[in-house]
């Protein structure tokens, strides 16, 4: 192995790493993929949402054999206080299309399937292999990797860093800084197992239809965070995540937060009688556009979570990961076909292609949103949810109080909680961050 040279080494076998490895291998490049887990997906027991369009671009016939759980036909958005939720949902029969747009998946199963596709495309995949550091030449160019296996350096023309948000290779090589606590969320998740027919009945589903619930409000106890519930075939993925900086400041327990969420009056009936078999914690990049590090250099590129490519506003991550991996693979293959060296100047093609994609266009649009939610979390995740719940209950409760008095009471509660200036300021800041 030490005497063998590769066109590319991919570090990591998650969504972005698999997309990059598959793209390059399917174009004839000699690719080595290194994964520290026992198998791809071994550290990803949780459920997730798969965005079909992005995978279809890479593997057009993926639906033939991919381990898909349910196709999503309904999306629910909840704003919670301690005893209720106010929300909206969208459900459409259009989502029962021949090639559905979104699916729920179990990452452990899906990542193994994706890795088999990578191998079939011609890449070599080595698991239980930790890359300890990048190998650099005298000029500082990446020329390969050092691993915990015997044999020294494994050489390659370029290294793709797909090591996740807390990967150490880029920081050790000083290609990027350690992500700030306010740019990373910690999500804790559980898998609740129920019979398929019970899930269908509780959520009003048939066949392999699926439903997603996303909730924000007092469930995060004043922190910037989100709760979620995904329906799988015979299980429910439940979780909640908040900024690491807020966990540190409040000393809230992630486990206690999850326990409170699953016992919320709106959630508890959906989980009744379930058996919990799996628990996981996961770090998620939340810094947005302003937290994106340098994406390329001499002999290296960075993709997916390691590049902070996550759209927190729309809760999209796997699609950005797959797309960035694919684009990195396409850029490297194009440079290789021209017989150009993998220099920083040439690898800037990756960034140029990413700039033209939805990935950076979307992240750039919401560049100010992470800071707004981080610095104003109590109002957006406690004050306003409580006021919304009070207003909704006031609206639907029929008790003989004149409607004009109810409207005045709702307005007075808003002004008392935030003041007129506070309300205007929050609305303007939110509008500016959203535009």
From Swiss-Prot:
A single GO molecular function term of this UniProt record: oxidoreductase activity
Keywords: FAD, Flavoprotein, Nitrogen fixation, Oxidoreductase, Plasmid
Keyword set includes Flavoprotein: yes
Essential cofactor(s): FAD
Family annotation (InterPro entries): FAD/NAD-bd_sf, FixC-like
One Pfam family per UniProt: NAD_binding_8
Claim: rRNA-binding is one of the keywords in the record: no
Biological processes per GO annotation: nitrogen fixation
Positions of FAD binding: 8-22
Membership in a protein family: Belongs to the ETF-QO/FixC family.
Biological role stated in the UniProt entry: Could be required for the formation of a functional nitrogenase Fe protein. Probably accepts electrons from FixA/FixB and reduces a quinone.
PANTHER family reported for this sequence: ELECTRON TRANSFER FLAVOPROTEIN-QUINONE OXIDOREDUCTASE YDIS-RELATED
Protein name: Protein FixC
Organism: Sinorhizobium fredii (strain NBRC 101917 / NGR234)
